[in-house]
């Protein structure tokens, strides 16, 4: 029953994608029906909602890596490169189209490159259709290569929290399934401390429990790695010709409390925010996922 329920949920959430190579033909109205349809099926089958697949039941995957474009569509930087002195952040907060655009637009030249992909799952090199089925364990994610001399990890973290509803479990807006769960994955102890401390502060600000998955990137080495690039047509999708302005993220309109009130004392100097409150007053994520209709170019302050 568990596997049947999970696969039906994934099939409904990605019905069009299983029939076509891209998910752009799905209208927002069509996707809005998915939660109701899935809810009815769960009632019939006696399930409680999407549940993460067990590693031993995940699809086997493949050795071949996904082919992607060499350069970022907007920033022009190399997609699979981490320059010296740069760091990486990987997170998931809903449909990766809008999540990626919000991050690449952050000002100050600190964001060197972004990419969308499948993270925190158990199947090597999954396809979109496989990840969307719920049978790989992945969630739609964003990989950020950034220059810590120009933008703080805390700036990225704040955007992450404020750009979605981190309390919604295995869904984000009209998108339902384990592939839409919220998550942030750390590469060192500093990132771990900052993620956990900011979560506690934002949870208090929201007034309800946060369901965001927090885990070490190294936890997924046994499954081939944390991160796999998505297909080329998903990369910087909202900046591609003919892109449909779809975004299901649910910003709550609530700010992360001031850094000084929640940051671990030992990290306050090294990770002080570089984006000032003037930026957040003008460009903070707004209800309605306004990022989809914003310019493609990075914000200039």
Task: Describe these PLM feature segments.
Residues 25-28, 33:
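Short linear motifs centered on serine/threonine within intrinsically disordered regions
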Residues 1-25:
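N-terminal chloroplast transit peptides
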Residues 5, 28-29, 147-148:
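Short coil/turn segments at secondary-structure boundaries
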Residues 33-301:
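Flexible coil/turn and secondary-structure edge motifs
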